[in-house]
Amino acid sequence: MSRYRGPRFKKIRRLGALPGLTSKRPRAGSDLRNQSRSGKKSQYRIRLEEKQKLRFHYGLTERQLLKYVRIAGKAKGSTGQVLLQLLEMRLDNILFRLGMASTIPQARQLVNHRHILVNGCIVDIPSYRCKPRDIITARDDQKSRAMIQNYFDSSPHEEVPKHLTLHPFQYKGLVNQIIDSKWIGLKINELLVVEYYSRQT
């Protein structure tokens, strides 16, 4: 299944706020109206919607998300927590959380078009897994810095999570540590996502 490129507002009306996909938010009460129209949700649908939230927020294909779930399942610790850490440490998401892009699709475009350096080297893979002590910067050219400055100017100034440090005048971000679950910028029950996939096998 390919990455979603359809109407974004349609998704947030059904699933709630997805800040990685769009800065728009559903109207207050729209979630309650949707529930009343469709009646009581089945357990399967609840698990499916949590999975879809994760997929659309991070801009993943179905195959990519399944791959992350399998990697998380083989790691030590809670599968759900490891899954969120893997997704949060993607380069496109780090750029978004630093405020160097307004959405994750915009961050992915910056990476694909070779505007971003990690530790002084161009990285053009949005799924690149960042590590503590990584230094993320814009390329030292006018176009790259102008694009990021535009995002700084147009985006709402969200607080940068504690595992990151932003130096906006240098167009630079630092990864201080692996993210803690309380800094995740999405309202999600990751255990339901893991349960969804465990029931598919």
UniProtKB/Swiss-Prot annotation:
Pfam families: Ribosomal_S4 (PF00163), S4 (PF01479). It comes from the Eukaryota. PROSITE patterns: RIBOSOMAL_S4, S4. GO terms for cellular component: chloroplast; small ribosomal subunit. Part of the 30S ribosomal subunit. Contacts protein S5. The interaction surface between S4 and S5 is involved in control of translational fidelity. One of the primary rRNA binding proteins, it binds directly to 16S rRNA where it nucleates assembly of the body of the 30S subunit. With S5 and S12 plays an important role in translational accuracy. This is Small ribosomal subunit protein uS4c. It comes from Eucalyptus globulus subsp. globulus (Tasmanian blue gum).
